[in-house]
Amino acid sequence: MSNETQFEKLLSDVRETLDIEVKETLDIAGDPNHRAALAKEIIALANHGGGFVIIGYEEKEDGDFVPSVNRKPSMMDWSTDKVQSIISRYVDPHMQCSVTQTSIPNSEDRCVIIAVPGGHKVPVRAKSGSPDN
């Protein structure tokens, strides 16, 4: 299955599962606690066997996810280099995640999908904590 097809499937029915984590927004450029929170999600997914972090959706009271109105208007912060620098700072052992910005179905808006690999030979752990810890 191509990445594009896989992303279309993920976004056709956004929900959290053991291998999918959904976040409304994270300020990874300006807030070190948000960078640490992203690293924590990546660690959990990596230890589970891999998965995806979807940025740009919020959970409604009924449990459904919809595109977030609070996400940053610019997705410029979400590059592979930026996410890899967070992984280098907080995650051990180092891993390579792919970061894709893609269109939200039936919308002109975009979201971010981070693909987290699984199958690590040793447990993935935090190299350092958030600044508040």
Question: Residue spans of the language-model regions?
Answer:
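Conserved N-terminal catalytic/coupling substructures associated with nucleotide/phosphate chemistry
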Residues: 1-133
